From Swiss-Prot:
It holds the Pfam family Ubie_methyltran. Its EC number is 2.1.1.163, 2.1.1.201. The gene is ubiE. Methyltransferase required for the conversion of demethylmenaquinol (DMKH2) to menaquinol (MKH2) and the conversion of 2-polyprenyl-6-methoxy-1,4-benzoquinol (DDMQH2) to 2-polyprenyl-3-methyl-6-methoxy-1,4-benzoquinol (DMQH2). It is an enzyme of class 2 (transferase). This is Ubiquinone/menaquinone biosynthesis C-methyltransferase UbiE. GO terms for molecular function: 2-methoxy-6-polyprenyl-1,4-benzoquinol methyltransferase activity; demethylmenaquinone methyltransferase activity. NCBIfam families: MenG_MenH_UbiE. It comes from the Bacteria. Keywords: Menaquinone biosynthesis, Methyltransferase, S-adenosyl-L-methionine, Transferase, Ubiquinone biosynthesis. S-adenosyl-L-methionine binds at T71, D100, D124, A125, S141. InterPro entries: SAM-dependent_MTases_sf, UbiE/COQ5_MeTrFase, UbiE/COQ5_MeTrFase_CS.
Length: 252
């Protein structure tokens, strides 16, 4: 047992155990991952992801890390956008490297089909199997709250980015108005676990996912953590009144 603890939903567990517990959750939800995101966001996650891809604006020849990229939902968006830019003005293929801790998620993504620009790697966000100054952009979507040591993952993101590289993190966050916060809390705790039980036959996994959102830092606190990891010009944009937020920073 280690001397440190980590959050697992509303529980505090030994930090050495969290990764295995989270892996177990995603082993169970991998085949229903898109349904899970639809439940967690009311289907709006597709619009949020489109907005992140537009903000990234992938270009030919860029190297992009899609950390916790799981089933490849974001990576496919990036590949298609980079290919369209390539058709307009030429240039080499983009490289999009999905890195995910969970092999079941990666297998689910491969089964759905990929794009020629996409590679798949099983790896830990806290210890990426990639060299220093490797990528032009690092994106993590709905993944960082599941990491045992968020600060370590942020430092790794900074390490693997080239000078001038971009960091983008899409994550569930804190609604900015009290009525919306109360409504989303009611939906999260009363509806999502029950529907998860009906749809995926796994109430506990969905209960964890809801609780993990509530334990995640608010927008400004998380922005400060990104700055502490060495990123500059850190900003955040709220989506759907703060139900989710996109944080951005630069490796300068």
């Amino acid at each position: 047992m280690s001397n440190t603890s980590a959050s697992f939903g509303f529980k505090d567990v030994d930090a050495s155990l969290k990764a295995g517990l989270v892996r177990g959750v995603f082993d169970r939800v991998a085949k229903n991952y898109d349904i899970m995101n639809d439940l967690m966001s009311g289907g709006v996650h597709r619009l949020w992801k489109d907005a992140v891809a537009a903000r990234l604006n992938p270009q030919p020849g860029e190297v992009i890390i899609d950390c916790a990229g799981g089933t490849g939902d974001m990576a496919r968006r990036f590949a298609k956008m980079a290919r369209k830019a390539q058709e307009r003005r030429g240039g080499p293929d983009a490289t999009i490297n999905i890195v995910d801790y969970n092999a079941e998620m990666i297998m689910a993504g491969i089964e759905r089909g990929g794009e020629p620009e996409i590679t798949w790697t099983v790896g830990d966000a806290q210890r990426l199997p990639l060299p220093d100054a490797y990528a032009d952009a690092y994106v993590i979507s709905f993944g960082i709250r599941n990491v045992t040591d968020i600060n370590a993952a942020l430092r790794e993101a900074r390490r693997v980015l080239k000078p001038g590289g971009r960091f983008l993190c899409l994550e569930f966050s804190r609604p900015v108005t009290e009525p919306l916060a109360k409504a989303y809390d009611a939906y999260s705790f009363k509806v999502i676990p029950q529907v998860g039980e009906w749809v995926a036959k796994d109430r506990d996994a969905y209960q964890y996912l809801v609780e993990s959102i509530r334990r995640f830092p608010d927008q400004r606190t998380f922005a400060g953590m990104i700055e502490a990891a060495g990123f500059k010009r850190v900003t955040f944009t709220n989506f759907t009144g703060g139900v989710a937020a996109l944080h951005q920073g630069w490796a300068i």
